[in-house]
C-alpha cells in the first residue's frame, strides 16, 4: 500500500502497516460511544516501529468474555454492546489469555481437577446479571455435571479394573503356594520311602543313650495305655448288653400282653356275629318254652324290662349283664315268634305253622343291635382294664341307690321321685314302687297290639 486506507474500508480493531521507508502504523481502536450525542469517532494510533510487517489482528478468542482494548487518548468512555461496565464479568476458559481476566471478579475460577466446576454466586448477583450471563452459567453447570458423571464412570471402571487385578493376583499366589506345598510333600515322601522310616527332627546336644531311654519309656507308656483302654470297654459293653436285653424282653412282654386283648376281642366279635347270623337264618321250630318265657318276663326286674324295651343298651354294660341281656333278647324273640305262630294257627283251619320268615324284621334288628352293644361294652371294659394298672372300682359293679335312713318324709318323697342311672345295664330306673306294675301293663298291652297286627297281616295275605 502506498497510502493510508480510509476508515470505511478498514474494520475497527485492525492494525495496517505500510511498506514506505518511514513505516507508519495505523491502529484503529474499537468504536467509542459518547453519552451525549452517541457519535462514532474512530481512534487512530501511530507507531514508528520498523520491525512490524503485515496485518496484525488484535482479537481475543474467548466464548465467554471479550478482550478489553485500552481507552483512547481522548478519554472516551468504553461501553460494550451486551452489558454495562458496572456488571460482573465471567471468568475466561483456558483458551483465553490470562492477562484479560479480571482479578476482582466475585465468581471464583475453576478448580484444578474439574474445569467447569464453578460455584454459583449469590441470588442477588444472579439477578443483577444479564440473561446471556445467566445462560452461560447454566451451560457451565450442566458441563460440570457431565464432567462429574464422567469422572464417576472413570472411577468405577478403575475400581473394577483394580478388583479384577486383585482377583487374578490371588489366583496366581494360590497356584504358586499349591505348587510349593506339593513339591515339599513330594520331597518328604521321597525321603521317607528312601530311608524306610519317618524322619524326625533331631534335638540339639542329644545323647543316644538318653534318646534310647526316652524311647523305651514312651513304649512302656503306650503299652499301659493300650492295655487299660482295651480292658475297660468289654466290661462296660457286657453290662450294656445285659441291660439292653432286659429292656427288650420287657418291651416284648408288654407288647404281646397288649396285643393279646385286642385279638381276643376280635375273636369274640367274630363268634358273636356268626352266632347271630346263624340264629337269624335257622327257623325256630321248638315252641316248648312259651310259659317259661312269660313267667320269666313277669318275674323280671324293671331294669331288665326297660333295657329290653329300649332295644339298644348303653355302652357301659359289664360282661355279666351283657350275658343276661343276650338271654333276655333271645327269650323275647322266641316269645314274639310264638305269639305270631299261635295267632296264625287260630285263624287257619289247616293248622299250618308259619316259619321264621313271618317274623317281624324289627325283632331281628333289635337282637343284632343288642349283641353289638354288648360287644362294645366288652371292648370298653377290656381297654380300660389294660390301660389302668389298678382294678376297676367296686362302685361300677352295683346299682347306685339312694341313701337309707332319712328322717324327713319330704326328702324321702323327693328321692322316690328321682330316677337313677344304672351303670351296669345302662337303663334308667325310677325309685317309685308302682313302676313294675306299670311296666308290666305297658308290655302286655304292646304285645296284644302286635298280635293283632300280625293277625291282620295274615288275613290280608289270605284275601
Swiss-Prot record:
Where does the record say this protein resides?
A: Cytoplasm
- Residue ranges that the Swiss-Prot or TrEMBL entry lists as coiled coil: 145-177
Keyword Cytoplasm carried by entry: yes
The keyword Coiled coil belongs to this UniProt entry's keyword annotation: yes
Keywords noted in UniProt: Coiled coil, Cytoplasm
Q: Please note every region of biased composition (Low complexity).
A: 96-110, 225-238, 305-322
Q: Which domain of life is it from?
A: Eukaryota
State the signal peptide span: none
| Primary location | cytoplasm
The transmembrane segments are: none
Q: Where is the composition biased (Polar residues)?
A: 17-32, 40-55
Here the segments flagged for biased composition (Basic and acidic residues) are 288-304
A GO CC annotation recorded here is:
cytoplasm
Region described as Disordered: spans on this chain? 1-110, 180-255, 281-358, 388-413
The similarity annotation says: Belongs to the TDA11 family.
Q: Which protein, by its recorded name, is this?
A: Topoisomerase I damage affected protein 11
Instruction: Give the source species.
Output: Debaryomyces hansenii (strain ATCC 36239 / CBS 767 / BCRC 21394 / JCM 1990 / NBRC 0083 / IGC 2968) (Yeast)
Amino acid at each position: 500500500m502506498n497510502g493510508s486506507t480510509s476508515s470505511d474500508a478498514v474494520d475497527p480493531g485492525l492494525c495496517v502497516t505500510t511498506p514506505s521507508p518511514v513505516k507508519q502504523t495505523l491502529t484503529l481502536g474499537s468504536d467509542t460511544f459518547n453519552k451525549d450525542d452517541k457519535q462514532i469517532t474512530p481512534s487512530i494510533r501511530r507507531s514508528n516501529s520498523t520491525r512490524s510487517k503485515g496485518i496484525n489482528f488484535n482479537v481475543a478468542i474467548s466464548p465467554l468474555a471479550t478482550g478489553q482494548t485500552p481507552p483512547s487518548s481522548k478519554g472516551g468512555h468504553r461501553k460494550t454492546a451486551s452489558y454495562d461496565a458496572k456488571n460482573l464479568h465471567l471468568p475466561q476458559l483456558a483458551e483465553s489469555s490470562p492477562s484479560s481476566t479480571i482479578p476482582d471478579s466475585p465468581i471464583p475460577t475453576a478448580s484444578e481437577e474439574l474445569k467447569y466446576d464453578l460455584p454459583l454466586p449469590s441470588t442477588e448477583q444472579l439477578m443483577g446479571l444479564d440473561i446471556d450471563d445467566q445462560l452461560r452459567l447454566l451451560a457451565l453447570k450442566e458441563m460440570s455435571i457431565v464432567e462429574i458423571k464422567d469422572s464417576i464412570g472413570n472411577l468405577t471402571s478403575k475400581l473394577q479394573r483394580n478388583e479384577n487385578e486383585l482377583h487374578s493376583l490371588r489366583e496366581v499366589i494360590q497356584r504358586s503356594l499349591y505348587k510349593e506345598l506339593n513339591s515339599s510333600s513330594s520331597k518328604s515322601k521321597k525321603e521317607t520311602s528312601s530311608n524306610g522310616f519317618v524322619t524326625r527332627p533331631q534335638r540339639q546336644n542329644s545323647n543316644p543313650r538318653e534318646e534310647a531311654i526316652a524311647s523305651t519309656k514312651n513304649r512302656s507308656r503306650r503299652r499301659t495305655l493300650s492295655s487299660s483302654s482295651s480292658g475297660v470297654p468289654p466290661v462296660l459293653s457286657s453290662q450294656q448288653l445285659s441291660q439292653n436285653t432286659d429292656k427288650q424282653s420287657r418291651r416284648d412282654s408288654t407288647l404281646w400282653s397288649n396285643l393279646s386283648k385286642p385279638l381276643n376281642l376280635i375273636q369274640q366279635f367274630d363268634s358273636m356275629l356268626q352266632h347271630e347270623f346263624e340264629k337269624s337264618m335257622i327257623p325256630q321250630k321248638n315252641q316248648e318254652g312259651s310259659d317259661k318265657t312269660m313267667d320269666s318276663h313277669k318275674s323280671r326286674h324293671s331294669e331288665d324290662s326297660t333295657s329290653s324295651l329300649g332295644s339298644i343298651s348303653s355302652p357301659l354294660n359289664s360282661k355279666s349283664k351283657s350275658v343276661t341281656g343276650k338271654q333276655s333278647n333271645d327269650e323275647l324273640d322266641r316269645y314274639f315268634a310264638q305269639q305270631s305262630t299261635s295267632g296264625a294257627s287260630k285263624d287257619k283251619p289247616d293248622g299250618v305253622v308259619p316259619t321264621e320268615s313271618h317274623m317281624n324284621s324289627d325283632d331281628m334288628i333289635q337282637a343284632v343291635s343288642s349283641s353289638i352293644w354288648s360287644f362294645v361294652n366288652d371292648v370298653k371294659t377290656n381297654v380300660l382294664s389294660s390301660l389302668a394298672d389298678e382294678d376297676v372300682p367296686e362302685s361300677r359293679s352295683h346299682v347306685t341307690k339312694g341313701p337309707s335312713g332319712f328322717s324327713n318324709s319330704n326328702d324321702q318323697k323327693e328321692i322316690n321321685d328321682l330316677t337313677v342311672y344304672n351303670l351296669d345295664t345302662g337303663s334308667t330306673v325310677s325309685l317309685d314302687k308302682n313302676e313294675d306294675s306299670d311296666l308290666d301293663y305297658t308290655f302286655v298291652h304292646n304285645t296284644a297290639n302286635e298280635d293283632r297286627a300280625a293277625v291282620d297281616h295274615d288275613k290280608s295275605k289270605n284275601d
